[in-house]
UniProtKB/Swiss-Prot annotation:
Species of provenance: African swine fever virus (isolate Tick/Malawi/Lil 20-1/1983)
Pfam families hit by this protein: ASFV_p27, BIR
Name of the protein in its database record: Inhibitor of apoptosis protein
Gene Ontology BP annotations: symbiont-mediated activation of host NF-kappaB cascade; symbiont-mediated suppression of host apoptosis
InterPro entries per record: ASFV_p27_C, BIR_rpt
Length: 224
């Protein structure tokens, strides 16, 4: 989860002031809960408790400061992310207090450095990897922009991971085994990457005996 406009308050203001919410209609937790519930979003309480309400499938908004966040649906710590990017939000100040907000930001800095920045590097790495593999620019934009978003997750399914989402680095890893060109709907063998195969297969006839056991353990496939 990250802000739609990539800005960050560099300090926490010590001035005491009253903040009028930008979206008064979502000031109550019930109103924010309802914004998620009517769109059949599950486990939405952590977002509404963080002062956020549903805007679109790719965007949520803080009712108080008005900051918008993208790629939010699998975020585990929305309160921390909200406080990290919007340090002078009236809701965050009222919820945690200035001292509590400072402590939370300090603890979140490690997560942001080790997780978020690494994912950004993986994104850049994946673009270069896909380019080297001969994929078109339109396909690379498709992967990088929509890898986490439904309905595009159906293209890469049955992925066994500890988390519910996969990183961009894993996309590159998967595609290095199974070369798929969405532009002309051609699928290649997961092992040799040379022989063309049917859409419902994973290996060419020559590679099937060598990879059947490995495929059963890894348990992923690509569906077009």
């Amino acid at each position: 989860m990250y802000p739609k406009i990539n800005t960050i308050d560099t300090y926490i203001s010590l001035r005491l002031f009253e903040v009028k919410p930008k979206y008064v209609g979502y000031s109550s937790v019930d109103a924010r809960n309802k914004s998620f519930a009517i769109h059949d979003i599950k486990n939405y309480e952590k977002f509404s408790n963080a002062g956020l309400f549903y805007t679109s499938p790719t965007e949520i908004t803080c009712y108080c400061c008005g900051m918008k966040f993208c790629n939010w649906i699998y975020e585990k710590h929305p309160l921390q992310v909200h406080g990290f990017w919007s340090r002078n939000c009236g809701f965050m100040r009222a919820t945690l207090g200035i001292i509590g907000l400072k402590k939370m930001i300090d603890s979140y800095n490690d997560y942001f450095t080790n997780e978020v920045s690494v994912k950004h590097k993986n994104r850049v790495y994946t673009h270069k990897r896909l380019e080297d593999m001969g994929f078109s620019k339109s396909f690379m934009r498709f992967i990088l922009a929509n890898a986490f978003m439904p309905p595009y997750r159906k293209y890469i399914h049955k992925i066994i991971l500890n988390e519910r989402y996969f990183t961009f680095k894993f996309v590159a890893y998967l595609l290095s085994f199974h070369k798929v060109n969405l532009d002309n709907q051609i699928t290649y063998c997961m092992t040799c990457g040379i022989e063309q195969i049917n859409k419902d297969e994973n290996f060419c006839n020559a590679c099937k005996p060598l990879n059947y056991k490995h495929y059963k353990i890894l348990n992923f496939s690509v569906k077009l």
